[in-house]
Amino acid sequence: KANGRKTFRQIDSVSRILELGRDTYREGKLSRESIKMICEELEGLKHKMEEYKITEYRAYATSAVREADNMDLVLDVIEHTTGIRVQVLSNSEQRYISFKGLVAKYSDFHQVVSKNTAFVDVGAGSVQISLFDKNNLVVTENIPICAVRVRDYLALIGHKSGRLDEIMADYVDNDIVSFRNIYLKDKEIKNIIAVGEVVSSLKKIVPELSIKDVITRAQFDAMYKRVISMPAQELAEKYGIPYERATLMLPNITIYQSFLNNCKAEEMYVPDVDFCECIVANYMDEGSRVVFNHNFEEDILATANNIAKRYRCNRNHVEQTAYFALKIFDVVRKPFGLDKMQRLQLQIAALLHECGNFINLHDGARNSYYIVANTEILGLSHKERMEVANVVKYNPLYLPSKDKISAELDGCDYIVIAKLAAILRIANILDKSHMQKIEDISVTLKDGKLIILAKTYEDISLEAGLFEARADFFEQIYGIRPVLRVKRSV
């Protein structure tokens, strides 16, 4: 419930754990029995919503449904059986919502991330690691360590070996070490913020330590020894933990231990934040119902900038291209129905449009497409990221008609791609020399023309000569003709 002070309070809470991941990660799809249980539980929640006269809701599915081969069938059955429409979150959307919830609830967040900090989000299907430095998001990477698969592997070999902790560490360490070698190198991580489904349960198993929000390395080691020495059933009964979560405690704590060992952090922050609270925080933020002391868009752009840095993009060129692109966008935004997210997509596309040159210069645009399409950008859905990838691809390349590439678009909006690519082509050509000859531009829409007034004291014959060809495509998409005019600065 939201109140007038732009905060919210919980008025009721109901929950039920259904272990759907077991089906997906073992069999590749959700079983008929699991689908039936989902529908039964959602019917109960539907009655609860009717009790409170709820008219607006959010129903999300994550990796257990997202990675199931029968995902579309599952969603269709749920909607027709319960009337509830479920939205499947991409991994980046899911982790971004978790991040928002952490910022909303954890009052010490900004103080902690002022130093080199790793945000480690362990889910049932994978692990998301995000690195912060001086309050800025430096990099985020999804590592395919599946806690459910790790648990099943433990069950398979556990009775055959007395070296369970060593085997477990070997199983997990490979991916964590690869992450360290690529992203950490000599960087020293001061803090770890641990979130995930079992973090609050982990704190319960060492009640004598009275752990609240911070775990020292010595406390963590004591916690690890207790988890590895007790079977899941005993952990569940002794500490009042749901059995399904108890079975995931050893895989989770092994993952955290591996990261602690590889980054040498001495403290781990464990705020009590569950995903439902994160969903509420995201809902409040989307509707501007609450004001966060954090700029999430800057985190998304920081991720894009670090991808550009990784692939040795010409920083001066891509930043000027982005600046010019946004100036054009802001003029055509309202009359042509563009929105805030598309502005962000355009900015990211401008920052990353040359990243493919790192692979080779012969086919840079297609290389850039593959890099963007396969790189995690926290805060963008799969569809939004693929639209950015296509904008980058069709910045220099011919854009075929929709019917010729509809299969390749994978649900992306063709019109959005065309509109953003048209802007990027103009912005990019204004710095064709990569020498920033144009100091600034002013953009106006007048008499069916987009007037771009370039301020420069340099010879921009190259840019002006190539401008007309790019203007043809822009006019084809928007129905207005870009015109380049030059204002000589002294």
Tell where the protein language model's regions lie, with residue ranges:
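Helical "lid/coupling" subdomains associated with nucleotide-phosphate turnover
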Residues: 4, 23-52, 64-69, 74, ...
